Curated annotation (Swiss-Prot):
EC category name: transferase
Subcellular localization: Cytoplasm
PROSITE patterns named in the record: BPL_LPL_CATALYTIC, LIPB
Name of the protein in its database record: Octanoyltransferase
Species in which this protein is naturally found: Bradyrhizobium sp. (strain BTAi1 / ATCC BAA-1182)
High-level lineage: Bacteria, Pseudomonadati, Pseudomonadota, Alphaproteobacteria, Hyphomicrobiales
Function description: Catalyzes the transfer of endogenously produced octanoic acid from octanoyl-acyl-carrier-protein onto the lipoyl domains of lipoate-dependent enzymes. Lipoyl-ACP can also act as a substrate although octanoyl-ACP is likely to be the physiological substrate.
């Protein structure tokens, strides 16, 4: 069965000519609340034409976040703080070893279509994983990017990257999280993204046997982003 998001034309997400997106990497871990406040302010500035679009790569200290569809019972073991957010989706974990990319784009200037935008983010992740010979796949009923796990049994799949977005005045924020080498046991304390089927778990690049670093992923992610959304330019970090 063809995933309907696979049939969407994603070429219209390339920005206007000469419009390079700021590309920023934070080397130290960023508190989630501080990152959220920064994104809110930056998205408002982009909408007002006062700041360029931005992709911000970072790691968080261990934290659970809950989207607009999150339920209290999704947190089984409150070993870390749970922060409510306005993004779509349910409960997920962020922490060291996970590459978070917050994508702040003016979709009004690109393509004001939330469903197609999510598909474009999935495509960016799939192309990133392809650089490491990992086949990431979409699923019609599960947002994010998945890998098949025949080693675990027939029909088993693991999520390797999560997506959660929010838009204000057609400017996106929040974004994606790719599991590079996080502590996967922390996902056991939640119902990740509301998925309860025991055949569907969580994995990472290192869990799949690949000695990949965050820097490796950053390089592949930037190339994948540019192939879907257009040019980037290096941006110096700011205090969030």
């Amino acid at each position: 069965m063809v995933n309907s998001r696979e049939t969407l034309d994603l070429t219209t997400f390339v920005g206007p000519a000469g419009n390079a997106v700021d590309w920023r990497i934070s080397d130290s871990r960023v508190d989630y609340a501080a990152a959220l406040a920064f994104m809110e302010a930056r998205a408002a500035a982009i909408a007002a034409g006062e700041a360029p679009e931005l992709v911000w790569l970072l790691e968080h200290p261990p934290v659970y976040t809950s989207g607009t569809s999150g339920k209290p019972e999704d947190l089984r073991d409150p070993r870390f703080p749970l922060v409510p957010t306005g993004r779509g989706g349910q409960v997920t974990y962020h922490g060291p070893g996970q590459r978070v990319a917050y994508v702040m784009l003016d979709l009004k200037r690109r393509r004001p279509d939330v469903r197609a935008y999510v598909a474009a983010l999935e495509e960016m992740i799939i192309r990133t994983l392809d650089a490491f010979n990992v086949r990431g796949e979409r699923r019609e009923d599960r947002v994010g990017v998945w890998v098949r796990r025949p080693d675990k049994g027939e029909g088993y799949e693991d999520k390797i990257a999560a997506i959660g977005v929010r838009l204000k005045r057609w400017v996106s924020f929040h974004g994606i999280a790719i599991n590079v080498e996080p502590d996967l046991t922390h996902f056991q304390a939640i119902v990740p993204c509301g998925v309860t089927d025991p055949r569907y778990g969580v994995t990472s690049l290192v869990d799949l046997g690949l000695p990949v670093t965050l820097t490796d992923v950053d390089l592949a992610l930037r190339q994948a982003f540019e192939s879907v959304f257009g040019a980037t330019r290096a941006s110096l970090p700011e205090t969030a």
